Amino acid sequence: MSVNPHTVPFENTPGVRATDDISRHLADLRYPLHLSFKILALASQATVTDATGKTVIYTKQKMFKFREHVEIFTDKSKATQLADINASKVIDWSARYNSTDASGQPIGSVGRKGWRSIWRAHYETFNPGDDIPDFSIREENPGSKVMDSLLGGIPILGMATGYLFHPKYLATRTSGQAVMRLTKVAAFWEGRFKVEKIGELSPREELNLILSFLMLVMLERKRG
């Protein structure tokens, strides 16, 4: 039986290129992670830090493009690129967002689950080489997201929504096993989220889900 090398422990997959780079980058990661967006920035900028304050990911999305393109760096210096995310087609509801590492090797992809995502966020994440989703990301408390979106656009009042409503998103395997959760946390002037790892993941799966959560937050912000 063939085995997808991206879903098993990395010490058992010596043939996967660039795997060691990702494994080393995530080796000393301490959860929970903290994802922050600069709401007032002209471009979409996001930073992911771990529990020790170490920067894990920094991105500044390219603006005014017909097709989504997000460059992922290891820190704000942008000296080392960790990954690249590109939309499979011109921006629409069915677009898939494909992640590759610095050498061009696939990390995985994420996309909205059809029309269900209009009312309740539902995304699917795929490991490289898989045609069926390996993970499902669902909004756990959609009412909170609706109120956060409705009030977030109201001057002054919108500043307080970060303290009142905390949308949560849970990533599960097809078996139903929960592996990672994203929760919006209280903050003024920026969007802040907490990422908790609650299940076993290979390093590439782990990065795939972190990037999937990153894209989810960016896309949900645009959706309102």
Predicted regions and their residues:
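Intrinsically disordered, low-complexity proline/glycine-rich segments
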Residues: 2-224
